[in-house]
């Protein structure tokens, strides 16, 4: 048997000045907020008989906070939102090996959200173990996303009556390990169909978040990694996505290639990423897409068993790009620090 129990807690205090444009007057209010999040997670796995694995688990999440505007002219505050929510979930996963060639996976999760209710989430799959360390998998599963506090309660177009987004994913994949694991490659084919997607209805005044969007995607993902020797390794992956309905921050094409070197205490890696057709806005009639290339470089030096130095450069080509319309990403960025592992 095996299992684990984990707990986390974090909080934040924020004061934001939205600024003002050239020729405009400074705004009088400042956004303020206090937020917190805590969670508890437990699972236990057991083998009941040969080839079997049964896992039971429970998750609890508490989150929320208080947001308000503070006015400088007279010092008064106006509430924006003061909400706290809880999510409780239990799940069971079952895995059974049938001989040496087939593995069956099935599971179900029930999630209760204090604002939007209860959701059942089933999934299942088959894995066929083929000769030469090859595996063919077929999977189907339900997915969902609960609306956020911001979407329901903070700023127009908030809507407290939003429901979860839902989808079903069908996936067929093939992977293989060759040359004692030095070469690994694989490919994925998938189809996603969903509804209740949260969109902003701009035909009303003020605009309002509603559950009327749809998602229907299909695509291909391929990956390959090769360990040349004890010092060098390379990897690459590519994905193509067809979207019947545009999805925010989703690219039509994504290509990645990277190489890494390590010897003794030293390590260095670099990668190049090409993005084409990334939707930064999906508003009907005003869709926007971005194309860009990102080059990153990272180096590290191990000081001792538990500490290492690192230096990193991101977007070294200083590309101007956005992931969400109106929010430009940084150009070339450099950082460094110390990693400590306990």
Predicted regions and their residues:
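Outer-membrane beta-barrel "beta-signal"
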Residues: 127, 171-173, 329-342
């Amino acid at each position: 048997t095996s299992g684990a129990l984990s707990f986390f807690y974090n909080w934040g205090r924020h004061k934001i000045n939205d600024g003002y444009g050239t020729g405009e007057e400074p705004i009088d209010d400042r956004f303020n907020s206090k937020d917190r999040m805590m969670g508890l997670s437990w699972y236990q796995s057991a083998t009941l008989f040969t080839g079997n694995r049964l896992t039971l688990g429970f998750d609890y999440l508490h989150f929320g906070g208080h947001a308000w505007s503070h006015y400088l002219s007279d010092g008064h505050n106006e509430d924006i939102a003061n909400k706290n929510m809880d999510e409780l979930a239990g799940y069971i996963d079952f895995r059974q090996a049938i001989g040496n060639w087939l593995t069956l996976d099935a599971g179900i999760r029930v999630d209760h959200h204090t604002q939007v209710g209860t959701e059942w989430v089933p999934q299942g799959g088959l894995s066929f173990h083929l000769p030469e360390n090859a595996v063919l998998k077929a999977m189907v599963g339900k997915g969902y996303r609960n609306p956020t506090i911001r979407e329901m309660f903070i700023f127009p177009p908030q809507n407290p009556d939003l429901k979860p987004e839902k989808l079903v994913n069908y996936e067929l994949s093939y992977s293989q390990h060759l040359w004692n694991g030095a070469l690994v490659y694989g490919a994925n084919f998938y189809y996603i169909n969903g509804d209740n997607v949260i969109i902003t209805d701009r035909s009303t005044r003020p605009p309002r978040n509603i559950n009327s969007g749809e998602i229907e995607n299909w695509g291909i993902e391929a990956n390959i990694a090769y360990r040349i020797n004890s010092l060098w390794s390379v990897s690459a992956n590519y994905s193509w996505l067809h979207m019947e309905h545009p999805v925010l921050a989703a690219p039509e094409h994504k290509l990645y290639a990277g190489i890494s070197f390590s010897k003794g205490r030293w390590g260095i890696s670099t990668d190049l990423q090409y993005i084409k057709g990334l939707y930064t806005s999906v508003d009907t009639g005003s869709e926007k897409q971005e194309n860009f290339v990102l080059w990153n470089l990272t180096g590290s030096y191990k000081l001792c068993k538990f500490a290492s130095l690192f230096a990193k450069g991101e977007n070294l080509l200083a590309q101007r790009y956005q992931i969400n319309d109106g929010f430009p990403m940084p150009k070339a960025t450099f950082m460094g620090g110390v990693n400590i592992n306990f």
